[in-house]
UniProtKB/Swiss-Prot annotation:
Protein family according to the UniProt entry: Belongs to the ODC antizyme family.
Biological processes, Gene Ontology terms: polyamine biosynthetic process; positive regulation of intracellular protein transport; positive regulation of protein catabolic process; viral translational frameshifting
Alphabetical keyword list: Polyamine biosynthesis
Gene name per UniProt: oaz1
Subunit-level organization: Interacts with ODC1 and thereby sterically blocks ODC homodimerization.
Source organism of this protein record: Xenopus laevis (African clawed frog)
One MF term in the entry's GO annotations: ornithine decarboxylase inhibitor activity
Record has Magnesium as a keyword: no
InterPro entries: Acyl_CoA_acyltransferase, ODC_AZ, ODC_AZ_sf
Protein's UniProt name: Ornithine decarboxylase antizyme 1
A cellular-component GO term for this protein: cytoplasm
Length: 216
């Protein structure tokens, strides 16, 4: 369960708007779309241990996936080939159609109680959800939106892990590392088969611990 982590997110300073934002680098994608032949089910026991895992982010060239992250307003990337994936009073999620039936590109828009809307893009692959923390100043409402998305990942998607990624050259990199470690995320060492080979990016993972009764 992530209830305690959700409360920590709401109390954290990681998502607070800063006076001086970082330079945006949205043109550089951090994740790639895998081919269906490379995806396979495998265990993931510890972020610091290079165990077996799906080579869905191998060196084989894939079309780049741009994940700009939350924008803090109602602007969204409209895709003519997007289908409704999920919708409730807090989330509206559309899926971009791809040739890979094991990988889903999700456009997430969360509606907050104060009327704000925050948008994210994510990749759902092999029961793992990948979210990029956007460069620059995070929009107002980001922490609440992230908490909603994390809760949805656990209760609705029932994923095994949630990965976040951000560029290593961020000015607030140290603060992000401290905050997400406090929330229960672990640093994923470079070269792990569950994350893309991107030396310019930092990946962290949250593993959901489920009771045996939840799996019945």
């Amino acid at each position: 369960m992530v209830k305690s982590s959700l409360q920590r997110i709401l109390n954290s300073h990681c998502f607070a708007r800063e006076k001086e934002g970082n330079k945006r680098n949205d043109a550089m994608p951090l994740l790639s779309i895998p081919s269906s032949s490379e995806s396979s089910r495998a265990s993931f026991n510890c972020c610091s241990n290079l165990g077996p895992g799906p080579r869905w982010c191998s060196d084989v060239p894939h079309p780049p996936l741009k994940i700009p992250g939350g924008r803090g307003n109602s602007q969204r990337d409209h895709n003519l080939s997007a289908n409704l994936f999920y919708s409730d009073n807090r989330l509206n999620i559309t899926e971009e159609l791809t040739s890979n039936n094991r990988t889903r590109i999700l456009n997430v828009q969360s509606s907050l109680t104060d009327g704000k809307q925050v948008s994210w893009r994510a990749v759902l692959n092999n029961n793992n959800l990948y979210i990029e923390i956007p460069s620059g100043t995070l929009p107002d409402g980001s922490k609440d939106s992230f908490a909603i998305l994390l809760e949805y990942a656990e209760e609705q998607l029932q994923v095994d892990h949630v990965f976040i990624c951000f560029h290593k050259n961020r000015d607030d990199r140290a603060m992000l590392l401290r905050t997400f470690r406090f929330l229960g995320f672990e640093i994923v060492i470079p070269g792990h088969p569950l994350v893309p080979k991107r030396p310019d990016a930092c990946f962290m993972a949250y593993t959901f611990e489920r009771d045996s009764s939840d799996e019945d």
